[in-house]
From Swiss-Prot:
Any GO CC annotation of this UniProt entry: transcription preinitiation complex
GO terms under biological process: maintenance of ER location; transcription elongation by RNA polymerase II
Species annotation: Rattus norvegicus (Rat)
Posttranslational modification: Dephosphorylated at Ser-266 by the PNUTS-PP1 complex, promoting RNA polymerase II transcription pause-release.
Name this polypeptide is given: DNA-directed RNA polymerase II subunit GRINL1A
């Protein structure tokens, strides 16, 4: 066996079954384009043998896919026909179930014959509250279990065929059953309508009997709407008006002031309270301006305003001249010092001479 170089692993076998037909065709097109390049094929050591092998494999896989696809297309209309028949059978089953449910509803509505519409409605409400009916569905048979005895009328019973039977035989049987059920429902509906009688509302006997039979109706009293309850509660417990918001006032002080106002103080006490509030504001907050150190603004005539402007301009020019002279002196290093041309000796001479004059005057 020839030893492979280190780090080299043989390529894994390609699984063409996982790839789609479009991917296989794309690979086939690329391999054929490589095979048509003669210069590239001549440079290969195997002269394009691997490429030709892969092309053959791809063609075989594509042909196999096409064959499988053709077989599935042959069975496509059969599957569509089966689906349509299955849908038709399910529709027939649902129609039968609806007819049976309507039949059962008509049976339960005819528990008490020859009674008024009010009695029928009250019996429906009591039957829903006291004796609820239970419907049990087993296969295609339905049984009605109620708290009281119920007169059930004959209804068509449906039996299902085996799933292995043909659909063509199943459809006409169901259609005949549906027709029978619809005719029985119509006849039942007509009989129930004939049994119902409209009673006169002026007769007090039937109303009394209906109320005696159903005491739950007497206990029901008309309830007040919610907004009426809220209005009555608000009238009994009135809410005080909200206090106005005041700046720079603590909530406790505001509550105290509101309580004092409600008690009804004298005008003198209210003035005292205002004075204290102002003093508190002046001491604590900076909401007020400081007292003025100068007189407030005054109206001046045109002559006075011109004189003030000229004076201000002169002062400004003098200040500018002083600043310019100071800057020039600093730039030229000129230092202004006291000048004494006689020096210190002249001063001393004068002082000594004065002493001599004093001595001579003493001797005299």
């Amino acid at each position: 066996m020839c030893s492979l170089p280190r780090g080299f692993e043989p390529p894994a076998p390609e699984d063409l079954g996982r790839q789609s037909s479009a991917e296989l065709r794309e690979r086939l097109r690329r391999q054929e384009r490589l095979l048509r390049n003669e210069k590239f094929i001549c440079k290969l050591p195997d002269k394009g043998k691997k490429i030709s092998d892969t092309i053959a494999k791809l063609k075989a896989a594509i042909s196999e896919r096409e064959e499988v696809r053709g077989r599935t297309e042959l069975f496509h209309p059969v599957s569509v026909d089966c689906k349509l028949r299955h849908k038709a059978t399910t529709r027939v089953d649902t129609d039968i179930d609806k007819a049976q449910n309507s039949d059962l509803m008509l049976d339960t509505s005819s528990l008490v014959p020859e009674c008024s519409s009010v009695d029928i409605e009250s019996s429906k409400t009591t039957s829903e509250t006291q004796g609820p009916t239970h419907l049990t569905h087993k296969g295609n048979e339905e049984t009605l279990a109620t708290g009281c005895t119920v007169n059930t009328c004959p209804s068509a019973r449906i039996t299902t065929q085996d799933p292995s039977s043909e659909v063509n035989e199943h459809l006409p049987q169901h259609s005949s059953q549906v027709e029978e059920i619809s005719s029985s429902v119509d006849s039942l509906f007509i009989t129930k309508l004939q049994k119902i009688t409209i009673a006169d509302q002026t007769e007090p006997s039937e109303e009394n009997t209906s109320t005696e039979n159903f005491p739950g109706l007497q206990s029901e009293t008309p309830k007040k709407p919610h907004y009426m309850k809220v209005l009555e509660m608000r009238a009994k417990n009135p809410v005080p008006p909200p206090h106005k918001f005041k700046t720079n006032v603590l909530p406790t002080q505001q509550s105290d002031s509101s309580s004092h106002c409600h008690k009804g103080q004298s005008p003198a006490s209210s003035e005292e309270h205002r004075r204290r509030a102002r003093q508190h504001l002046d001491d604590v907050t900076a909401a007020r301006l400081l007292p003025l150190h100068h007189l407030p603004a005054q109206l001046l005539s045109i002559e006075e305003s011109l004189a003030l402007q000229k004076e201000q301009k002169q002062n400004y020019e003098e200040m500018q001249a002083k600043l310019a002279a100071q800057k020039l002196a600093e730039r030229l290093n000129i230092k202004m010092q006291s000048f004494n041309p006689e020096g210190e000796s002249s001063g001393r001479y004068r002082e000594v001479r004065d002493e001599d004059d004093a001595q001579s005057s003493d001797e005299c």
